[in-house]
Amino acid sequence: MEDYDLVIIGAGPTGLFATFLAGLRDIKSITLEALDYVGGQIPELYPEKPVYDVQGIPKINAIKLRDQMYEQAKTFNNRIELNSKVTDIIKENDIFKIEVNGVYKYNARAVLLCTGIGDFTPRKIGCEGEDRFFNKGLTYTVKDTEKFRDLTVAVVGGGDSALDYATELANTARHVYIIHHSENFKAAEKTIDLARKNEKITFIVNSSVISIDGGSKLESIKIKNELTNDISELGLDALVVAIGHVGRANIYKSLPLQLSPNKRGVLVNSKLETNIPGIYAAGDVASVEGEPANPLIAIGGAQAYQAINYIKKYINPQASFFGGHSSNLKI
């Protein structure tokens, strides 16, 4: 068993920044990632997506942002272990025993959960033909817009991901349709405006996809107007379903964590503490009492900073809460 001050679970954006901050505060940490890559949702869901809401960076490709976060996380040589799924956590006295892939490997004085929305799968439309045409014209993510060059594409959804996909696809596709069951979109105002101004994007609102058709690959979809019940057919080369993901917080059988009402997050107080002393959470997994959910990289980063400072005080009560300015360090 190896001993650490802190085990960080998850190497998405929040976990990577927490790794850097732990090094900044001289906290001996190890970061455990279940997947074989870092970055969490970025490489899996939107590697080609431009990111605009990180302080000081007007625009950056998501995968490039991930790479820069990874480089920053390695600044102090704190360990990051991939293919390391935490399968259980046991608290004995003031020490947490961390089980990885079924084997107890690490002891830690504190744990920081940065697991995002946990194990997740794309939310499906639930219509006829959806499973049949998966990877045969139907996809739930856009990892490479070049694969859609000169194709006629429809994107189903009304959130930021759907409209961002549509705008990016318009750069390579012949034409893009956005299909949404309502007239009201959940995306940011500027995201909606950008899509509406694009001549290669057509909005089909108050409508739902009821079937997906084709031969060896997707060729068309049937759309039902929710107001008139009229059914129409739309010829397509590709369909992107972007209506969210079904997530659930990782559950550790020996750790009675208090979950949020929707079971997708862990309840924390204003100090990012869970109901178990020594266990903290930051990022999408953290459901802060009395606050709305803010699934943003910037919010996760701020929470990581706050959590690491509280963890420093937890493992060393004599330490100052604020560790000073990084600009004062020669790193």
Curated annotation (Swiss-Prot):
Annotated residues for binding of FAD: T14, E33, Q41, Y46, V86, F120, D284, S327
InterPro entries referenced in this protein's UniProt entry, alphabetically: FAD/NAD-bd_sf, FAD/NAD-binding_dom, Fd--NADP_Rdtase_type_2, Ferredoxin-NADP_redctase_2
Top-level EC class as recorded in UniProt: oxidoreductase
EC number: 1.18.1.2
Pfam family, one: Pyr_redox_2
Ranges in coiled-coil conformation: none
Note on cofactor: Binds 1 FAD per subunit.
Co-factor(s): FAD
Keyword Thylakoid: no
GO MF entry, a single one: NADP binding
Assigned keywords, A-Z: FAD, Flavoprotein, NADP, Oxidoreductase
Protein family membership: Belongs to the ferredoxin--NADP reductase type 2 family.
Quaternary assembly: Homodimer.
This protein's name: Ferredoxin--NADP reductase
Organism this protein belongs to: Picrophilus torridus (strain ATCC 700027 / DSM 9790 / JCM 10055 / NBRC 100828 / KAW 2/3)
Taxonomic lineage from the root: Archaea, Methanobacteriati, Thermoplasmatota, Thermoplasmata, Thermoplasmatales
